[in-house]
C-alpha cells in the first residue's frame, strides 16, 4: 500500500507544480511538433523563448561575462521511482552523496517522484552550490504515469536548447515521458537522456535518433543511462569505461561520452555502497 500512497501523493504534487509553474514562469511555453519519416519514433520537441523550462532555473543575462571553467561532470540514475523511493531514508542518502560530489554539472535520471525533486532542488546546501537547474518535461505520461525523470544541477548558468520526447516506446517506459535534454554551459554542449530499459534494440534506435537530431556540431558530451552494454561500439567511439555501473545486471549502462572528439575526458565510476540509495553507481568525468 505504501508505494500506492506515494504515487497518489506524486500526482497531487505534480498538479501543484503545474499551478506554480504557469503562475511564475515568465517564458512563453510552446510545443513544436516535428515531422519525421521514421514511424518508429515520433518526437515532440519542446522549446521556450527563454531559458526557463518547467519550474526551472534562475534567469540570467546571456551577454553577461561569466567565466566558466568546467572541471568535472557527473551522471547518476538515482532510482527515485515511487515503487522504490518510499523505503527508509533513501532520498536523504542520495542527497548526502550529491553533496559530496565535486562536480560542476550533475545530470540525474529517474527523479520521477515530485517530492524527491523538490527535496533536491530546494535543499539549502545544494541550492547554494548549484544555483541553476534544468529539467525535462514535468508532465506525467497518461496522467498516472511518470515524467521525464531528468534533472540537471549546475554551478553555472544553463542555456536550454530543446527537450525531445520519445512517444513510441515499449513497457515499462511507455508509462514515462522519457526523452533527451539538450543544453549548454559556457561553450560546452550536453545531451542527457535515459533510454528504453530492458530492450536494447529500441534503446539503440533512440540513441541514434537523438544524436541525429542534435543541434550541436562541436564540443558535445552525451551522458546518462543509455541502457546499452555496448554503447561505445554502437556509436563507433573508443570505449572509455570498462567498469560496471548497474548493480543487479553487472552491466555498463551509464556513460559519459565525447561525441565530437574535441573534448578530452577521464572517466571514473564511484563504487560506494548502494544500500538504500540506488541500483546504479554514479559516473564522473574530469576534463583534461
Regions found by a protein language model. Give the residues of each.
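Acidic/histidine-rich helix-loop elements
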Residues: 70-92, 141-143, 170-175, 196-199
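Metal-dependent phosphoester-hydrolase catalytic domains
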Residues: 2-62, 201, 214-221, 226-288
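Structured beta-strand-rich core segments of catalytic domains in phosphoester-bond hydrolases
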Residues: 27-65, 105-187, 269-273
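Short, flexible/disordered intra-domain loops and linkers
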Residues: 83-89, 118-120, 145, 233-235
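Soluble or luminal CAZymes and related metallo-dependent hydrolases
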Residues: 86-94, 116, 173-178, 201-209, ...
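Flexible, surface-exposed loop/gating regions in the mature catalytic domains
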Residues: 78, 134-156, 160-194, 222, ...
Amino acid at each position: 500500500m505504501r508505494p500506492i500512497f506515494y504515487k497518489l501523493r506524486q500526482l497531487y504534487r505534480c498538479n501543484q507544480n503545474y499551478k506554480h509553474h504557469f503562475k511564475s514562469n515568465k517564458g512563453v511555453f510552446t510545443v513544436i511538433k516535428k515531422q519525421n519519416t521514421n514511424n518508429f519514433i515520433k518526437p515532440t520537441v519542446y522549446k521556450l523563448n527563454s531559458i526557463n523550462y518547467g519550474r526551472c532555473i534562475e534567469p540570467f543575462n546571456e551577454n553577461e561575462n561569466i567565466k566558466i571553467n568546467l572541471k568535472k561532470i557527473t551522471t547518476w540514475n538515482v532510482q527515485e521511482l515511487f515503487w522504490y523511493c518510499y523505503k527508509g531514508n533513501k532520498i536523504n542518502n542520495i542527497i548526502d552523496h550529491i553533496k559530496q560530489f565535486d562536480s560542476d554539472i550533475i545530470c540525474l535520471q529517474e527523479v520521477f517522484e515530485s517530492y524527491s525533486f523538490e527535496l533536491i532542488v530546494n535543499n539549502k546546501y545544494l541550492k547554494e552550490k548549484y544555483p541553476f537547474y534544468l529539467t525535462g518535461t514535468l508532465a506525467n505520461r497518461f496522467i498516472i504515469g511518470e515524467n521525464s525523470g531528468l534533472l540537471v544541477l549546475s554551478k553555472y548558468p544553463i542555456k536550454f536548447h530543446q527537450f525531445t520526447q520519445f512517444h513510441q516506446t515499449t513497457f515499462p517506459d511507455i508509462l514515462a515521458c522519457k526523452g533527451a535534454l539538450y543544453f549548454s554551459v559556457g561553450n560546452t554542449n550536453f545531451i542527457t537522456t535515459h533510454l528504453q530499459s530492458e530492450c536494447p534494440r529500441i534503446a539503440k534506435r533512440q540513441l541514434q535518433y537523438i544524436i541525429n537530431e542534435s543541434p550541436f556540431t562541436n564540443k558535445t558530451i552525451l551522458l546518462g543511462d543509455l541502457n546499452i552494454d555496448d554503447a561505445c561500439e554502437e556509436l563507433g567511439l573508443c570505449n572509455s569505461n570498462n567498469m560496471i555501473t548497474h548493480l543487479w545486471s553487472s552491466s555498463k549502462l551509464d556513460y559519459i561520452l565525447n561525441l565530437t572528439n574535441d573534448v578530452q575526458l577521464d572517466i571514473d565510476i564511484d563504487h560506494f555502497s548502494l544500500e538504500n540509495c540506488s541500483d546504479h553507481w554514479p559516473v564522473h568525468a574530469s576534463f583534461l
